Amino acid sequence: AKGPIKGFWIEAGYVTKNRGQDKPGNQIFAPNGFRRFFGLKKGKSSSTHIGEIAFETETGPLVTKNYRENDNGMEKLTLPKPEDHGFGVYDGKVLVFEPKGKRFLLTVVELDDFERVYGHRLANVSRMTGGRRFGELT
């Protein structure tokens, strides 16, 4: 082991245009169980709502977004609107989440930079069915 887990990450891949064709998308599918990284538990009823996540970013407002179960056995993570936080788009980038008290600091990194910046901290890397990778940071 490389030490305690200090964060986690997921490759965004293609992001659906859930806000309309003219705006960058802000929802990604995460693997079943990804909620545990956020300290969330599976919903008790038939509701798809799992909980809320409070995000902090380097620029832009604090934002709280929903986390849901999806009917395809995956989980749906709604992120802050990328244009409000200097991220441009999420497509093809890596989303890094680091706990800060009750919030999560969201950093968005180009795929090429991710290995260089975080490569030495990667732990428990897994791959989703569609090929996107996710894992933890030490």
Protein language model features and the residues they cover:
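Intrinsically disordered, charged low-complexity linkers and terminal tails
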Residues: 1-138
